[in-house]
């Protein structure tokens, strides 16, 4: 901030011309005062600095503490010239309160000076909220200001109760919020080093602070810290765990600290692992209900490495599997409902049933459609799971809901329709029959014109005719793309590769590529596993030697790609 005088006090006046109150108010409230200036020297020697403004009750000291050009040097001069540090404003504000909650770049020395000038010291009830308000101001107002370790230490040493509550919060609640928001994206806050944060928390504990104090919502400071959307604050979290916060306290919503983290807007995989490990090491085995909630709630939340996290959770909590239900839904149902494609992929690879219904008879596709909050991703998620759906009734139900599906990406919508036409033989004919119906045509007006929709369907239909005319050994390309059995598709692998490069298929080339890659990787991993287990198959002491290699291949093809991959590359234990 540039040093610019807003107001210049006239000191060359006759002795009969006294300094007016409004002049002092303007001077101390708005001027960028130089502590060596003749104006300041003139004022402190010729004006009663403890004279109060009639309405606000401000003295010269109060005015200066609210000055945006505040400096410690000027404040020291005022303190040395007898300002009364115990006088309150009309609103009840003490000077030391204004200093700690309003001023920037405060010197520890001036805080000590001001406190020492008060004969009541800080044990008086007027000062009971001073420490809390000091830290709160750095959290809410002065976000770029540092929390001075020496000031915190002084306030605690002078007898301020660290467990004093205001609106349910203690000073530690606000300090933990400061620590969390330092790492929150978009926040412009001064960094807090881990060593300094640890020293300040240690100061609180040494002076009797309750690390597990509850606010009005039942949250401990650690609850609040974990509930804030954070980014890469692994080391800070690790430091806070050294104070061994209580992991079993539930807030008013029934959430423990770990569940607060799981239900926040952002999950860091390494922090999740760290929290669970700390719980099991220091508390013991986690209750089954909490384990179940952790896994199900995790799926609903954005995370940095969802595939790694769900794998870790499923391996860690052995009694949670693909059949486990919570509120009538399986893990796969929840993953579909919240468009978590990474988790969907993992659960299907470990044999999760995409066609299973919820307790109230809803299919996964219906859960995706019903979740309006995720409407921008509805088509893409439906498109993602269509490759796993074989129930024609489900496909037909999807087709019937096409007019109401939100369209945010026309290319994804075209691909979705191409899948529906491929998997539902009756789709095109039913569309043609209803083409002239005004009710049918009007249903599509919300997201796109009917003519555009009709054009997409016609284009897809023409290409399906071309698929039916394209022969692949003893069948057609149309039948191959509709087949989900990778063992049957294996014999068409070479032909699929050839058609995959055929430029005449513009719409179905992506589906061809998916089919080809699925079969290719399945065949590759079957061969890898067979080669790896070959010494076992050929061991004369093993009964498997009695089986022909064709039968062994049949057995291996019954496994999922995930199973085959784990046999080929055994996962390390977490």
Swiss-Prot record:
SUPFAM superfamilies given in the database record: Ankyrin repeat
Q: Which Gene3D superfamilies match?
A: Ankyrin repeat-containing domain
Taking every annotated instance into account, which residue ranges of this chain make up the domain F-box? 541-574
Q: List the disulfide bonds.
A: none
Q: Which domain of life is it from?
A: Viruses
Q: Can you say where the ANK repeats lie in this chain? A: 56-87, 135-164, 167-213, 217-249, 253-285, 327-356
Record InterPro entries? Ank_repeat_dom-contain_49, Ankyrin_rpt, Ankyrin_rpt-contain_sf, F-box_dom, PRANC_domain
Record's keyword annotation contains Mitochondrion: no
| Keywords noted in UniProt | ANK repeat, Repeat
Q: Which family does it belong to?
A: Belongs to the poxvirinae B18 protein family.
Could you identify this protein by its name?
Ankyrin repeat protein B19
This protein's species is Vaccinia virus (strain Western Reserve) (VACV)
Q: What is the lineage of its organism?
A: Viruses, Varidnaviria, Bamfordvirae, Nucleocytoviricota, Pokkesviricetes
